[in-house]
Amino acid sequence: MLILTRRVGETLMIGDDVSVTVLGVKGNQVRIGVNAPRDVSVHREEIYERIRHEKDGDVPEAAPGQGADPQ
């Protein structure tokens, strides 16, 4: 794994077509912007895993705090 240090407003490039820019840092959260061609999917890891499981026909149960809120 390549580990990089970037400041707010700085960008890193992945190949020729994908850029990742640090938009802000607040506490332990980092806001990033991803610029990629339309044919490149960009997802948060948990969303990517859900999509992958749905494609395989294996839908995992919602994690605590996610999904419908029973009342």
UniProtKB/Swiss-Prot annotation:
Keywords: Activator, Cytoplasm, Repressor, RNA-binding, Translation regulation. GO terms for cellular component: cytosol. InterPro entries: CsrA, CsrA_sf. The keyword Cytoplasm applies. GO terms for biological process: mRNA catabolic process; negative regulation of translational initiation; positive regulation of translational initiation; regulation of carbohydrate metabolic process. One of its GO terms (molecular function) is mRNA 5'-UTR binding. It is found in: Cytoplasm. Residues 50-71 are annotated as: Disordered. The keyword RNA-binding applies. A key translational regulator that binds mRNA to regulate translation initiation and/or mRNA stability. Mediates global changes in gene expression, shifting from rapid growth to stress survival by linking envelope stress, the stringent response and the catabolite repression systems. Usually binds in the 5'-UTR; binding at or near the Shine-Dalgarno sequence prevents ribosome-binding, repressing translation, binding elsewhere in the 5'-UTR can activate translation and/or stabilize the mRNA. Its function is antagonized by small RNA(s). Belongs to the CsrA/RsmA family. Homodimer; the beta-strands of each monomer intercalate to form a hydrophobic core, while the alpha-helices form wings that extend away from the core. This is Translational regulator CsrA. It comes from Halorhodospira halophila (strain DSM 244 / SL1) (Ectothiorhodospira halophila (strain DSM 244 / SL1)).
